[in-house]
Amino acid sequence: MKILIVDDEIFARRTLERLLSMEEDVEVIEATDCYDAFALYEEKLPDIVITDIMMKGGIGGEWLIEKILASNPDANIIVCSGRQKTDLLKYKLMGAKYCIQKPIKYQELWDCIDELMKS
């Protein structure tokens, strides 16, 4: 399974990469911004995209969600954000399959990934 992690914070991105890489049959792809993430999405066709919302450079996760879903309406997107839970509902309505509030609990994230792979 291929998972694309999109986060401008290196610590958050690398922590997720290390944890997910420990799982069997998981290939992790990393992007620091949404432009690179969308290019990697189209090139690598990951099974799941895990993205932050607030990123440096002015283009955030909302743009990425819209671009990916325009390209593939069935894309599996998980939003991980420090925003309030009530704010995360917006991203579910946009088409994200799951929204997780930071700090991320690994088991919660893995449960979401597992559910997406079963469906």
Predicted regions, residues:
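Acidic, metal-coordinating helix/loop segments flanking the phosphotransfer/catalytic sites
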Residues: 30-48
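Short amphipathic alpha-helix used as the core "switch/output" element in two-component signaling
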Residues: 39, 62-73
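Hydrophobic/aromatic residues positioned on beta-strands within the core alpha/beta folds
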Residues: 79-80
